[in-house]
């Protein structure tokens, strides 16, 4: 059985997600895209990420990686360009763990 991970890409216009075969790098099944909420506050975007993993039916134990349109240092976003400025100084590790119910990378 293939090793699987879930990737979530948070962008200014959409939050995209897919399951990926870690051995081949290929997508497994459908990809999901949900428009980025407006305003794109941390809680609103995290709720969309939760919807992405629900639509993908990501099983407990499957690792989840999340990308942001900003640098992340020690789990914290120091500045933000494409989303709401309320992201500045948010600990995204804690935010995503709270919304997704598991640790993310």
Where do the model's predicted regions map?
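Short glycine-rich, Thr/Ser-proximal phosphate-binding strand/loop in the N-terminal lobe
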Residues: 2-47, 77-79
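A generic structural signal for short, solvent-exposed coil/turn residues
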Residues: 9, 25-26, 58, 96-98
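Glycine-rich phosphate-binding loop and adjoining helix at the ATP-binding site
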Residues: 30, 42, 46-50, 62-64, ...
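Alpha-helical structural elements of signaling/regulatory helical domains
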Residues: 40, 58-59
């Amino acid at each position: 059985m293939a090793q699987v991970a879930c990737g979530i890409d948070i962008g200014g216009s959409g939050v995209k997600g897919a399951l990926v075969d870690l051995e081949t790098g290929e997508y497994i099944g459908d990809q999901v895209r949900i428009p980025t909420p407006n305003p794109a506050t941390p809680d609103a975007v995290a709720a969309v990420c939760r919807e992405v993993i629900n639509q993908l039916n990501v099983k407990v134990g499957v690792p989840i990686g999340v990308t942001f349109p900003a640098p992340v240092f020690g789990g914290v976003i120091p500045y933000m360009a494409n989303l709401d400025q309320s992201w500045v100084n948010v600990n995204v590790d804690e935010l995503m763990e709270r919304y997704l119910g598991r640790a993310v990378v």
